[in-house]
Amino acid sequence: MTTARHLLVVDDEPHIGLVLRPYLEQLGYRVSFARTLDEARSAMRAVPPADALLLDLHLPDGSGLDFLRDLRKQGGTARLPVLVLTAEGEDRILREARRLGAALVTKPFSPTKLSQRIAMMFGDIKEGEPE
């Protein structure tokens, strides 16, 4: 029996969780949520930590981009798959997220697009492959 991959969704918008949890669980993922960076940091100290992050860039207690930079500096999370969920349109910020190794999905997004990006992030499908 394989263990479900654990996704930590870091987003302060409650409706994101209401929409994503049932959809992602139906796809076989275990899902937990953090609404602040402080909650996300605590969740990342859990044993075992999440297998991947879905990360908003704008959170009430700071920048998701700064959090991503911090993750990349730590040995245990330097290669953690991260998918940035954002309505951000500023190219400089999006380029920095990509430079830090994050995949991007812009809000609003379709569930199909999200599931494809997650599968690509884990290497289950290649870009351009059907799901």
Model-identified regions with their sequence ranges:
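Non-catalytic signal-transmission and effector/linker regions of two-component phosphorelay proteins
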Residues: 1-8, 112-131
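Charged docking surfaces used in two-component/phosphorelay signaling
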Residues: 18-26
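Active-site residues of response regulator receiver
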Residues: 56-57, 86
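Alpha4 helix (beta4-alpha4-beta5 surface) of REC/receiver domains from two-component response regulators
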Residues: 66, 88-106, 116
